[in-house]
């Protein structure tokens, strides 16, 4: 005799985290597209690398509702730590040279402003998604046996 048990419903914070992670990916893809309009666009190799990274991220994000804790922690480490570092190293390095954000923005064109807005949205989405993945109901969901 076998017994079938229904999978518990995916908690709202986990569902919201999926949406917010996908928004982060969308912001990253949009930023890449905007970079194509700038004087030093990414080359074919960089575009392929980014496409593979984004495809892998989307696969992980879509696996999040499965409740496997390893998926949650993989997202937290790869995107929350490594991905965030990749987003902030360039601006921090630029600021460390004494550059002025006010002067930059005053002289920036539409594409440069779009990059700043998209990068900021990307970072904000990562932070929100991380918080959502570790809300109490999400923690309980990921602790259950799978």
Residue ranges with predicted function:
Residues 1-146:
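Topology signature of small-to-medium multi-pass alpha-helical membrane proteins
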């Amino acid at each position: 005799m076998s017994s079938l048990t229904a999978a518990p419903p995916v908690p709202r914070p986990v569902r919201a985290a999926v949406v917010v992670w996908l928004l982060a990916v969308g912001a990253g893809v949009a930023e890449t597209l905007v970079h194509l309009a700038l004087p030093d666009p990414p080359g074919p190799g960089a575009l392929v690398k980014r496409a593979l990274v984004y495809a892998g991220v989307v696969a992980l994000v879509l696996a999040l509702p499965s409740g496997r804790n390893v998926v949650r922690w993989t997202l937290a480490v790869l995107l929350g730590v490594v991905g965030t570092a990749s987003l902030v190293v360039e601006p921090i390095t630029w600021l460390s040279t004494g550059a002025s954000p006010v002067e930059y923005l005053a002289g920036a064109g539409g594409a440069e402003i779009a990059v700043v807005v998209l990068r900021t949205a990307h970072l904000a989405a990562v932070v929100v998604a991380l918080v959502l993945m570790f809300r109490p109901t999400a923690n309980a969901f990921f602790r259950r046996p799978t």
